[in-house]
Amino acid sequence: MSNQVMLPRESGSFIASHSKDVSLCEEGISRASEIVFKSLKSNAYSYKTWKDHELHPKEMSKATVDWIFVLDTLNFSFWVDDGLEPWTIRHKGKDFQGYWALCAGINRAIEEGIHLTSPSYYRNITIDDLKHIFRSETSTEMPLLEERAKNLRETGNILAQTFQNSFAHMILLANKSAKLLLSMVINNFDCFRDDGDFCNQKVSFYKRAQILIADTWACFEGKGFGEFPDIDFLTMFADYKVPQGLYDLGVLQFSEALKQKLVTGQLIPHGDQLEMEIRGNSIWAVEKIYLAVKLKAKKSPEFSNMDSLELAQYLNSVIIDFYLWDFSKNVEARASIPCHKTRTIFY
């Protein structure tokens, strides 16, 4: 086995070329690229869309960097077992589930005077603290509370001891390089090191590490703490929601055996070949969509005058992932196949 860990883009290509139960449909990629391009071209979708969501912070400050870091330290595994009510946070008279419940819970805690976004606080956080902070309107608790507390303690201690008590200091040390910042995150925090073995090759996905950088970039609109000229180094964020959207768009194809597992709600263990095929093919599918959209952009008057660095800020795999995630959430109730169920801290 090669000890060299492939980065997510290489991993996606490698996994796609060695998969048995997941494949890509070129017609679906072509259709999806047309849909995405129309949305980008009409300015209906850009990094500014991130701040349109009511629960995301609007202020471009160091405090917001700390908010985003806590968000993506906890940004995983919101699905609940069949038959259970969803984990639900009520905030300002509205109920939120899943990822949005996480955002609402962080905001509610801050409003209640809890210093949840300070490493000095969460380096010592307990499960009971998290139970209170993320208390639910239903009988269903936030999943994986013990693992979430462990993540916060790990990252809080390292930020407090090594990085002047803030992820903002790591960003400054990375000197506007998304590539360097990704390396710093995965090398300093075990809970962000999302990799594994596939066909005797070490591969990586780095879902939360990449989305941490992408959320910062989007919130800060590519400026200040969010200035990353190489933002197009990042890939899509291989989770359980975007693959479902890619399947609905006809981009991903699943074997009958895999479809049966999904329809019957069977748990797929983290690190299983099926799980890696879903995630790796999703990365490679979005790369192919990105390349197709990029070709269209270069022929379009809206984008043709931009140089490659400028174009990368408007068009990249991050933006396409954001679009596909929102698409997947919007069609969730009528999706043609359920999400794959893997219980893990990595997504």
Curated annotation (Swiss-Prot):
E.C. code: 3.2.2.-
Function per UniProt: Catalyzes the hydrolysis of queuosine 5'-phosphate, releasing the nucleobase queuine (q). Is required for salvage of queuine from exogenous queuosine (Q) that is imported and then converted to queuosine 5'-phosphate intracellularly.
Family: Belongs to the QNG1 protein family.
Protein name: Queuosine 5'-phosphate N-glycosylase/hydrolase
Catalytic reactions on record: queuosine 5'-phosphate + H2O = queuine + D-ribose 5-phosphate
GO molecular function: hydrolase activity
Coiled coil: none
PANTHER family in the record: QUEUOSINE 5'-PHOSPHATE N-GLYCOSYLASE_HYDROLASE, QUEUOSINE 5'-PHOSPHATE N-GLYCOSYLASE_HYDROLASE-RELATED
Gene Ontology biological-process annotations: tRNA-guanine transglycosylation
Organism: Nematostella vectensis (Starlet sea anemone)
Lineage: Eukaryota, Metazoa, Cnidaria, Anthozoa, Hexacorallia
Keyword annotations: Hydrolase
Transmembrane segments: none
UniProt: queuine binding residues: 53, 237, 239, 321, 326
Catalytic residue list: 239 (nucleophile or transition state stabilizer)
Note: Eukaryotes lack the canonical genes for de novo biosynthesis of queuosine (Q), present in most bacteria. Therefore, this molecule must be sourced from ingested food and/or the gut microbiota, and metabolized to its corresponding nucleobase, queuine (q), before incorporation into cytoplasmic and mitochondrial tRNAs. Incorporation of q into the anticodon of some tRNAs contributes to translational efficiency and accuracy.
Domain of life: Eukaryota
